């Protein structure tokens, strides 16, 4: 499960919008919304890309929360 609050905060801290991130991942805004709201899971490749884009060092704190 994704830590939605922390991911949203990290996106904002990087001066990006959810639309910016969706475009970067080459997915629709709705697809990204579903992922960030834990309706669908992020793919491993998306987690890697997001971590690089947002400077996330510890992926577990955002993407693998129980």
Mark where each language-model region is:
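A broad structural signal for alpha-helix termini and local helix breaks/kinks
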Residues: 25, 54-55
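The alpha-helix within a helix-turn-helix
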Residues: 11, 22, 51
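Short C-terminal boundary/hinge segments that cap the last helix of small helical domains
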Residues: 55-66
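Short, basic-rich loop-to-helix N-cap that marks the start of a DNA-contacting helix
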Residues: 39-49
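A short, Lys/Arg-rich alpha-helix, primarily the initiator
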Residues: 1-15
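Short alpha-helical DNA-recognition segment
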Residues: 16-34
